[in-house]
Every structure is written in C-alpha cells, then in structure tokens.
C-alpha cells in the first residue's frame, strides 16, 4: 500500500482555525497552537453570551416596565398582578416597548391594572 501523507488535511485544519482567529493580536492570530486555544475560548464566551443575552434583555424590560409603572403610581409586581387579574396577556418585551414609545397607552394599561386590583 502507498504511504498516506496528511499534509493536505493538516493544512486545511490549520487554515480553518487561523481563519476563525482573524482579528486577534500577535500569536493568537499567527501560531496554530495558540490560535486554537483562543478560538475555543472565544466560542465558549460566545455560547455563554447567547444565554446571558436572554437574561439581560428580560432584566432590561422589567426595569423599563417598573419605571413606567411607578410613574403611574404602581410598583412592577402590583402592575403585573393587576394585568393578570384583568386578563391582559402581554409579554414583558411588548410592555417595555409600549412603556418607552407610547406613554398614554401604558397609562391606560396601568389604569386597567389598578381597576382589576381594586375589584
């Protein structure tokens, strides 16, 4: 049998990693062994970041809803409880958008929440 030389596969594997390390500084871009570690760590950070992004946005929405609810004389928890009792099912993303862009609409929602809490 003929001897199999693996130069092509090795070059392809190295090129793939070094392409992913584009934009890194110094050895992290140029040296395969260092670049491979840098790429693996970067992919770990990216994976973690995709999970954190969901948490961060939910926290931002809650902060915005809370600020708008307090302007209308309610705390966040009482506002959300009032909406639940009033049968209004809007998610936090939509409520935060209404709070930022449509103050009058949010005030109307707050009044409905107050009415449901009083009843």
Swiss-Prot record:
Gene Ontology terms for molecular function: rRNA binding; structural constituent of ribosome
Cellular component per GO, a single term: ribosome
SUPFAM superfamilies: Ribosomal protein L20
Domain of life per record: Bacteria
A Pfam family that the UniProt record links to this protein: Ribosomal_L20
Membrane-crossing residue ranges in chain numbering: none
Bridged cysteine pairs (disulfide): none
Alphabetized UniProt keyword annotations: Ribonucleoprotein, Ribosomal protein, RNA-binding, rRNA-binding
Family annotation (Gene3D superfamilies): 6.10.160.10, Ribosomal protein L20
Biological-process GO terms, alphabetical: ribosomal large subunit assembly; translation
Protein task: Binds directly to 23S ribosomal RNA and is necessary for the in vitro assembly process of the 50S ribosomal subunit. It is not involved in the protein synthesizing functions of that subunit.
Record-stated family: Belongs to the bacterial ribosomal protein bL20 family.
Name of the protein: Large ribosomal subunit protein bL20
Organism taxonomic ancestry: Bacteria, Pseudomonadati, Pseudomonadota, Gammaproteobacteria, Lysobacterales
């Amino acid at each position: 049998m003929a001897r199999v030389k693996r130069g092509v596969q090795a070059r392809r594997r190295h090129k793939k990693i070094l392409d992913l390390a584009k934009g890194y500084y110094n050895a992290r871009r140029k040296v395969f062994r260092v670049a491979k570690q840098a790429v693996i760590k970067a992919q770990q950070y990216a994976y973690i970041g995709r999970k954190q992004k969901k948490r961060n946005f939910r926290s931002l929405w809650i902060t915005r809803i809370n600020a708008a609810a307090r302007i209308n004389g309610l705390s966040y928890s009482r506002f959300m409880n009032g909406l639940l009792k009033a049968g209004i099912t809007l998610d936090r993303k939509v409520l935060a958008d209404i709070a930022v862009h449509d103050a009058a609409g949010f005030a109307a929602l707050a009044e409905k929440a107050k009415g449901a809490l009083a009843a």
